Amino acid sequence: MLRYVRAAAEDQARIEQFLGQFVDDYLVHEFPRYLTYKTGGIYLANDDDQLVGLSVIALPKPHEAYLGGMRIRPDVQGKGVGEEFAAFQVAEAERLGATVIRALVPRGNDASRSIWEGLGFRVVEEWVVGTIEDFQGPPYGNEVAGPAWAIDRQRIEAFYEQHPRDLWAMPDPWIPQSLTLDDIWGRLEAGGALVAPQEVGQAVDTLALYAINDRDLTVHYIRSMGTHLKALLEYLWVEARAWGVKTLRFGLPRPQADKLKEAAALPVLNEWRGLILEKQVGLSPQPSI
C-alpha cells in the first residue's frame, strides 16, 4: 500500500538520486525551490521504505492548484501506481482549498494524459517553456511600444475583456494559472508591463508582462492581436541589454509562444511542450497527510 508524505529539505539527496533514473530531466534543476513552499511542494509516494514516485503540487492562487512533474519509478510503471498517486494529488489539492486543478503533462505522454483524463480532467491548452539566447537589441527601443502606465488602465481593461480566460505563469514558467486584472496591475506597478501601441487614444493590441534580473528576462505573459509584437520585443531587448542580460525565458500557451518565436527570429533552446488539463472540483474536506 502506498504512503504519501510531503518532502522536506532533508529529503533533497534522496530526491536527487530518484530523479537520476530519468534522462535529461528538467526537474533535477527545478525541484529544490519547491521544497521551500509553505503550501504544497514536493510529495513523495513510498511503497514500504522505497520511493516509487514524486510530484509537485503548487497553489499559485488560493483557489487554483497545479499538479506537475509526476515521476514514477520505471519498474513500477503500468502497475497502477500512477493512477493511485494522481488521485491522491487531486484529493490533496482539494483539501488545500483548490476549486480549479490543472495538471501539466509532456506532449506525447499518452499514459500520463490518460491517467488525468480518467480522473475527469480535460485538455484546455498547450503549453511551451523555452529560452532564447544571444539576442541583439537595437540602440533604442521602438517608440511604438513601451512601458504601461496608470493612464493605460482603461484600454488595458478593454484588451483583457477580450481574453478573460488567458493563462500566465508568474513567477514560475512551469506553473500556469489564470490571469486577472489584479495580476496585470501588479506587474504594471512593478514596472513589468509593456503595451503597444503607446498612443493613449488607440486600442491595445499587444500586451506583455515580464520580470528581469541579473541572470535573465522572463516573459510571463504575452498576447499580440496586431502587428506590434516585433516592436515590443525590440523594446524588451533594449531593457535586457541595460541589465546586461542575454537570456529570455518564457512559459506561454502554444499560439503565443509560436508568435514570440517567429517575431524573435531566433532558435528556442531547451524547448518543452506539453498539455494543460483542467478539472473543476468542490470544497469538501479531505484528510490531511
What is each model feature region?
Residues 1-29, 136-177:
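Short amphipathic alpha-helix that is part of the acyltransferase structural core
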Residues 44, 50-58, 66, 71, ...:
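Conserved beta-strand in the GNAT
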Residues 59, 104-105, 122-136, 267-280:
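Conserved catalytic-core motifs of GNAT/GCN5-like acyltransferases
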Residues 59-68, 77, 210-221, 269-271:
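A conserved beta-turn-beta hairpin within the catalytic core of GNAT-like acetyltransferases
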Residues 72, 78-92, 114, 118, ...:
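Conserved acetyl-CoA-binding loop-helix of GNAT-fold acetyltransferases
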Residues 83, 107-125, 254-270:
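Conserved active-site alpha-helix within GNAT-family acetyltransferase domains
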Residues 86, 92-108, 115, 242-253:
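Conserved GNAT acetyl-CoA-binding A-motif
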